[in-house]
């Protein structure tokens, strides 16, 4: 989505009393790095190159740009499936300046890291999601943000594909459909790695998985 279209979407949602949930990655950076991998390596079969093509800077820049557009429109937004500390810092800066910004993250960014992309290619492709899994240090920042109530929801970005569909990227990882399942596993993962490990409370888990999403999307108190 180009900036003009985003401005128009946010403006219309403001008129309707709605709110946008926006995936934030700079596609120009991604496309340039995909070309660079092809040029330097002569192919894109090595899945371990995948996270390099979608760096944390691509997320942080897109978050920053979205928030500036939202400020021009004077409307709140939701940054969905936040995966990096860099993107989180952009949101904190906007909040400090008075903007209303909500954050969603997902279990995959809380419990897995980019080491999955060093597995054998057939297995590694199963973990190709967008944004990609990140370095482990980002998990600590996201968990702390959840503990402090600075992240509002934990969703899944559920988008499942079969093994056969993932094989579309066997010769070129950029052809792999990005996504993985998560809706069924989300409560168990957050309970085990969040509540049982004392990173968040059981009450917070209920707020992030149920109450806050219902409030953000105007389903409360019928849901949540």
Task: Put a short name on every predicted segment.
Residues 1-154:
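Histidine/acidic residue-rich metal-binding segments in metalloenzymes
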Residues 45-74, 126-127, 152-154, 160-224:
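His/Asp/Glu-enriched, well-ordered alpha-helical/loop segment
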């Amino acid at each position: 989505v180009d900036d003009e279209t985003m401005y128009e979407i946010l403006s219309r949602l403001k008129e309707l009393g709605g709110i946008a949930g926006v995936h934030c990655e700079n596609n120009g950076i991604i496309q340039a790095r995909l070309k660079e991998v092809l040029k330097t390596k002569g192919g894109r079969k090595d899945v371990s190159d995948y996270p390099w093509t979608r760096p944390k800077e691509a997320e942080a820049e897109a978050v920053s740009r979205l928030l500036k557009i939202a400020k021009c429109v004077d409307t709140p937004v939701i940054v969905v499936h936040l995966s990096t500390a860099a993107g989180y810092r952009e949101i904190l800066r906007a909040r400090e300046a008075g903007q209303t910004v909500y954050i969603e993250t997902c279990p995959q960014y809380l419990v897995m890291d980019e080491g999955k992309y060093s597995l054998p290619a057939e297995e590694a492709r199963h973990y190709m999601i967008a944004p990609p899994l990140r370095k482990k240090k980002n998990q600590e920042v996201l968990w702390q943000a959840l503990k402090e109530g600075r992240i509002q929801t934990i969703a899944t970005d559920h988008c499942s594909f079969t093994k056969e569909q993932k094989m579309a990227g066997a010769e070129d990882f950029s052809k792999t459909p990005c996504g993985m399942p998560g809706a069924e596993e989300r409560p168990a993962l957050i309970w085990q790695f969040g509540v049982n490990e004392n990173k968040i409370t059981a009450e917070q888990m209920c707020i992030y998985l149920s109450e806050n999403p219902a409030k953000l999307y105007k389903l409360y108190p019928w849901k949540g």
